[in-house]
């Protein structure tokens, strides 16, 4: 950890950081913000007066935003504070089905498509103002449609191309169905982090009496694509 801190002290920030937690990702966004506030207040104390680290330490990095809907069911993205010149990180959970909205008196649960559209609305509101735009999408939108079989659409590749065309420089996700989909955007940043280690830590913590040997434990891959995780 000390080596990481030392490396961080020698690295200049790209720009003052701001964090947008979409409605689908509010709780996780708040946890990330709380960690950032604590981490930055407890480390790198020698740089407080440097203009290169303006707004490095803050009581909150969250940006107030919303995606209100018209009576027709259409929506718009609103940033309620300036993000000009910032290194903007936008977090969204496209699989949060608990959120609802009303159209003509009918209650609708938000689908991944709805969450993706709201993400693009916020990106559109920030384009041309933020110094850099990064998207954190724990579940990669349309990641299961990463290749074409017969006459099918290439939804994941199209989504990645669309985001980068709107000005997104980096896309961060976890356990993408096939990380090779990043070939659709070879000149942009794409990171897919594998979580098996975190899964095992959580499993051992939740089941402390778990016996790990060839007689009592078997790890099975649901398909060929997940074999590397099981191994």
Enumerate the predicted regions with their spans.
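PRPP-associated nucleotide enzymes
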Residues: 1-231
